[in-house]
């Protein structure tokens, strides 16, 4: 059957060897120094992808990963999530600790984002208006415990 999941917690900087693992369904590349996601672009079987605490900003290699249901992008250098607009199977998106993220327009353009989905926005600079707009789609928007945004679900 081969490998279907990998867990990384090492000092990884180059993920190009992963490009050949096209049947992976779960990948965790947490707390590394990954700056280029291009090798992931062909991993079209991925359902869960965790990329927390790296150093990338460009999400365009994820554009074609249409089977993704869970995507964790916590603690990176993300300012633009436009490539996520076509990931219609996403059910949970974690964007925490991306303080330069100010717009989530791509989520409004994504027809798959809606009732029952979860979007984590703690420690971003997404406006209350955008958070409310997302909540109006039936999305559970998670934000700071003491957020001034009325529609957000507070997390501890």
State what each model feature region is.
Residues 1-35, 39-57, 61, 66-79, ...:
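Concave beta-strand-loop units of leucine-rich repeat
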């Amino acid at each position: 059957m081969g490998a279907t999941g990998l867990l990384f917690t090492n000092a990884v900087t180059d993920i190009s060897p992963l490009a050949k693992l096209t049947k992976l369904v779960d990948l965790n590349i947490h707390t590394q120094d990954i700056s280029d996601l291009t090798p992931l672009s062909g991993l079209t079987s991925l359902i869960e992808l965790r990329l927390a605490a790296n150093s990338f900003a460009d999400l365009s290699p994820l554009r074609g990963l249409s089977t993704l249901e869970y995507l964790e992008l916590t603690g990176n250098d993300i300012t633009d999530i436009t490539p996520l607009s076509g990931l219609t199977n996403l059910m949970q998106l974690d964007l925490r600790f991306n303080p330069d993220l100010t717009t989530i327009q791509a989520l409004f353009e994504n027809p798959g984002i809606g009732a029952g989905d979860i979007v984590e926005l703690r420690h971003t600079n997404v406006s209350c208006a955008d958070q409310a707009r997302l909540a109006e789609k039936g999305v559970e928007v998670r934000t700071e415990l003491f957020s001034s945004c009325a529609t957000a679900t507070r997390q501890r």
